[in-house]
Amino acid sequence: MMTKIKLLMLIIFYLIISASAHAAGGIALGATRIIYPADAKQTAVWIRNSHTNERFLVNSWIENSSGVKEKSFIITPPLFVSEPKSENTLRIIYTGPPLAADRESLFWMNVKTIPSVDKNALNGRNVLQLAILSRMKLFLRPIQLQELPAEAPDTLKFSRSGNYINVHNPSPFYVTLVNLQVGSQKLGNAMAAPRVNSQIPLPSGVQGKLKFQTVNDYGSVTPVREVNLN
């Protein structure tokens, strides 16, 4: 029982210290999503450590849309130590075969940060370390697309089928839907894949117009759109 109490106190203490540290600074990524033009040799995203005295071990990798680690990408450096008040650049290089030329391909970039521990200050005590995993969408975009990504949300077609909202996305771009709401019922965020039909679960009995927003290439939320569900 005492061991559990000590562990709980240790967790609470760590969270308080961690919250204080993050108030003074933190680890930040230079984007919330990455657009990788298919003809580019590489793309990059910066990572900044604004802490004044804390170092972090940073580990990065890319997964496919199924959550499996993707070997067709190289990230340099894949593992490094982020020093206090420093900025580093993660370079992303696609080395795989050509992908679909008529639509975007989706991947996920993962960045895990682990705070360093001063072993000399521990004096044999146990310390709970909390790693933070940040995930962002990576879109590999074909260069020959004629459509504009900013126009993709306006091409979406919505209809209702029982307890589902059918979403048809005729564009070649992934469209991230946020702040979805039917009537007064709020729904979870969703993503409409390019050139396919998808469905969004809808609680039974919900009536009203569909309101939603989207996220553009820069990670900004667009104005509210409103459509009727036929």
Curated annotation (Swiss-Prot):
> What keyword terms does UniProt attach to this protein?
Chaperone, Fimbrium biogenesis, Immunoglobulin domain, Periplasm, Signal
Explain the consequences of disrupting this gene: Deletion of the operon under classical laboratory conditions does not result in any major effect on E.coli capacity to form biofilms compared with the wild-type strain.
Q: Which residues form the signal peptide?
A: 1-23
Where does this protein chiefly localize? Answer: periplasm
Q: Which PROSITE patterns match?
A: PILI_CHAPERONE
Q: Which Pfam families match?
A: PapD_C, PapD_N
Per UniProt, subcellular location reads as: Periplasm
Gene Ontology CC annotation, any one: outer membrane-bounded periplasmic space
Q: What does the record note about the induction of this protein? A: Expression is negatively regulated by H-NS and subjected to cAMP receptor protein (CRP)-mediated catabolite repression.
What InterPro entries does this protein map onto?
Answer: Ig-like_fold, PapD-like_sf, Periplasmic_pilus_chap, Pili_assmbl_chap_C_dom_sf, Pili_assmbl_chaperone_bac, Pili_assmbl_chaperone_C, Pili_assmbl_chaperone_CS, Pili_assmbl_chaperone_N
Please provide, alphabetically and separated by semicolons, the GO molecular function terms listed in this UniProt record.
protein folding chaperone
Could you mention a single GO BP entry for this protein? cell wall organization
UniProt-listed PANTHER family: CHAPERONE PROTEIN FIMC-RELATED, PILUS ASSEMBLY CHAPERONE
Query: Which additional comment does the entry carry?
Result: The operon is cryptic under classical laboratory conditions, but is functional when constitutively expressed.
What's the family?
Answer: Belongs to the periplasmic pilus chaperone family.
Q: What does the function comment of this entry state? A: Part of the sfmACDHF fimbrial operon. Could contribute to adhesion to various surfaces in specific environmental niches. Increases adhesion to eukaryotic T24 bladder epithelial cells in the absence of fim genes.
State the name under which the record lists this protein: Probable fimbrial chaperone SfmC
- Name its species: Escherichia coli (strain K12)
Q: Which gene encodes it?
A: sfmC
